[in-house]
Amino acid sequence: MTPAAGLGLKPQHYDEALAATAPGLWFEVHPENYMSAGGPRLTVLTAIRTRHPLSLHGVGLSLAADADPDPEHLQALKTLVDRFEPFVVSEHLAWSTHRGLHQPDLLPFPRTHAALSRIAGNIGRMQDALGRQVLVENP
């Protein structure tokens, strides 16, 4: 099936997503909501994936932070990518961590050569960890 129209998947829409039959329909999910060893969310996502393509769109990797991406986050993301085989993996280009503290927001980054170099390195580390190209979205 060629993906044609996508919807953001939220738990309150699970029943409709499971019943949907439109050709070309795909769903975008935030991988951070599915980074667990099991549970009902993964069960439902597995059922949806048997019927529709998925896109994983991350919001928590903090690619513009002043540190490398969290290796545990990258490993959890890799586990989801391997399990669900999304046709697209993307991540927000922002920062949300600083000195080990997590901010519950996508914060802007300075538009400097140093920031660009750091971001390019972090995108490279993400792609290397996942073994595939990724898309980035500016907040």
Predicted features by range, described:
Residues 3-9, 25-29, 54-57, 89-91, ...:
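Hydrophobic faces of well-ordered beta-strands that scaffold small-molecule active sites
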Residues 3-12, 61-68, 108-114:
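Active-site mouth loops of central-metabolism enzymes
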Residues 6-36:
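N-terminal ordered "arm"
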Residues 10-12, 30-34, 59-62, 93-94, ...:
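Active-site beta-loop-alpha junctions enriched in small/polar residues
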Residues 14-15, 31-43, 62-72:
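Acidic-and-aromatic substrate-binding clefts and catalytic sites of carbohydrate-active enzymes
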Residues 16-22, 39-56, 72-87, 124-129:
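Acidic (Asp/Glu)-rich catalytic clusters
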Residues 51, 58-69, 84, 93:
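Structured, acidic catalytic/metal-binding patches in enzyme active sites
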Residues 70-139:
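Active-site acidic/histidine proton-transfer and metal-coordination neighborhood
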